Regions:
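Glycan-recognition and catalytic cores of secretory/periplasmic carbohydrate-active enzymes
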Residues: 1-196
Length: 196
């Protein structure tokens, strides 16, 4: 996700294409809502599976989508190229394939995505590894700070600076690789990302 944000930063900065800005904002919002831990830093990762099934939290059954979306289904299926066979083990990973939509269609898709997000949030989430790793947090915070500048997003900038200050407090005496239950001595990567 961090490298994807960095790539979107570059695409938007070079092209000023609002499509890239939207994808950038969606990804940053996902990271900020799903990866923050109790220390107001970022956890490490999510497991791939929930309820013992790989990808279950993120994939959609064709019939489930059709029943959930009703009359909104056809446009959504067109945008995400949904099939009964699916694109991952009989289910559909929502991969955008059609982005030439009218303003009204974009608005409808946006509302539909919110419905599905609410529906997905009712599912059992994958296990979250909430430990804060220095290298990962430094890399992410640097990338988010750049995103705030590229998109001129003052809220993102202030939230990122707040997280940087929190991380600085943890690093003030000694740099560790990760914090929480146990402190693990730093690796070279931790020093490199902290210095950048």
């Amino acid at each position: 996700n961090i490298q994807y944000i960095g790539l979107l930063n570059k695409f938007f900065q070079k092209t000023n294409n609002l499509y890239y800005k939207k994808k950038l904002e969606q990804t940053v919002n996902f990271i900020n809502s799903e990866f923050k831990n109790d220390f107001d830093l970022y956890g490490s990762a999510y497991d791939a599976d929930s309820d013992g099934v790989e990808g279950k939290y993120y994939v959609w059954n064709y019939t489930e989508l059709k029943n959930t979306l009703g009359p909104k289904f056809n446009l959504f299926a067109k945008k995400y190229n949904l099939t009964e066979e699916g694109n991952f083990e009989g289910s559909n990973i929502l991969t955008e394939t059609h982005n030439k939509l009218s303003d009204d269609e974009i608005k409808e898709i946006s509302n539909t995505e919110k419905i599905l997000l609410d529906q997905r949030n009712k599912r059992a989430k994958p296990l979250f590894d909430d430990k804060s790793q220095t290298d990962q947090n430094c890399f992410l915070l640097e990338t988010l700070l750049f995103s705030s500048l590229v998109t001129d997003n003052e809220d993102l900038k202030q939230n990122t600076l707040s997280s940087i200050n929190i991380l600085e407090k943890y690093l003030s005496d000694k740099i560790f690789h990760c914090y929480q239950d146990t402190e693990i001595d730093a690796f070279l990567e931790d020093y490199v990302y902290y210095a950048s």
